[in-house]
Amino acid sequence: MSTQPDPVYGAGPVADAAAFDAVNRETGKATGLPNPAYTSDRFSVLERDGLLANTWLCIGAAGALTARGQARPVTVLGLPLFMVRDADGINVFHNVCSHRGHQLVNLPCRMRGAIRCPYHSWTYGFDGVLKGTPHIGGPGVHAAAGFDKSLHGLKRIRSERWMDLVFINLSGDAPPVEAFLAPLADRWRPYLSDDDPSRLKLAPDDDNFTLEIEANWKLAVENFCEAYHLPWIHPGLNRYSRLEDHYQIIEPGRFAGQGTRVYDPVYRNGAEFPEFSGWPADRRKVAEYIALFPNVLLGLHVDHFYAVVLVPVSHNRTREEMNIYYLDDAANGDTYRESRRTTREAWRSIFFEDVGVVEGMQRGRQSPAFGGGAFSPVMDPPTHCFHRWVASGMLAARP
């Protein structure tokens, strides 16, 4: 492939195919993604339209929208979207009115009966169909000759659900979500019986949390993939789940992460959570932490499951939304309230410890002295796996 700058991508390291080719070398000889992959607005748009649009991107938890008409806006690298619960499930649309382009949903809300544009009060059903066009034909005239409402509904985005998570495919032509998830489903099949996923329920809002990070979303993925930083960034965790207790997880092109062999839940004054019925007794202390590319961080334990949705707001802003799931009544029952709070605070503490690291890497990417860095051939293969996924996708997206 030519290493000449591509006029569509622009001159400089953002466009240089050689920079991406260098990522695809063997781990000990590879270079990481170039700085503009983290610092450039233009790269973010190209990344969104050429990489993220062609796969399945997670945008949130369906369980957070419990009633018909509940809606929530989501911004993906500047692209305004929203999801809304209808009688048949969750629908996802571009967050823009078909009339004059006003944004429809600004904040999480519960809408009664219809989606209403605040500008001229055009209304849409929760299925996206245009229902009302007040005064379109003049005062008191709500229809216009030649105007076909069926052609002006909201623009729906292809979406699917898995483990309560809502995934979207912006391009509309990605392989089925089942194929996308198959390698992960195969990996976790020994731990989960067929009915275990249906037993999972999202904990109440106050048993979850959100962190606002001033950094590129990819840095949060990279940090999550590896256990290398545990002794220095998570000294409390490292006291019982040491670096040597972890193992690496790598599925090229799909996911990467780490596992531990010493997971030990602490309930303090709370009740013990129910456990997955299919979990092998001899692996009860195993827990796995997997970054499912591109943007969801998963934690599977014998007694709970979590999904951190990384919402890439802009090239240097990421929202980390922690969604914790428990089995059966443990998600909402008063009996387990203290146990849920203990679990939430434990995870919040750990993820908060990572904030400074991720933001520090973002600041460091402003330095011309850094050119992607290096990878430990022993400790960094999961992180390198993610870099290769990004680099390969960006190369494939070049005209």
Regions found by a protein language model. Give the residues of each.
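N-terminal pre-ligand scaffold of iron-sulfur
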Residues: S2-P108, R158-S159
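C-terminal catalytic domain of Rieske-type non-heme iron oxygenases
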Residues: S2-Q4, V84, H94-N95, E160-R161, ...
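Rieske [2Fe-2S] iron-sulfur-binding domain
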Residues: A64-G172, E178-D186
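N-terminal short leaders/motifs
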Residues: A11-D41, C109-S121, K155-M163, N238-F273
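Short beta-strand or tight-loop elements
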Residues: T55, L77-L79, K155, F293, ...
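Short Pro/Gly-enriched beta-strand edge/turn motifs at strand-loop
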Residues: A53-A64, H135-A143, I290-P294
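Short linear motifs in intrinsically disordered
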Residues: G60-L65, F147-K149, K285-Y289, N323
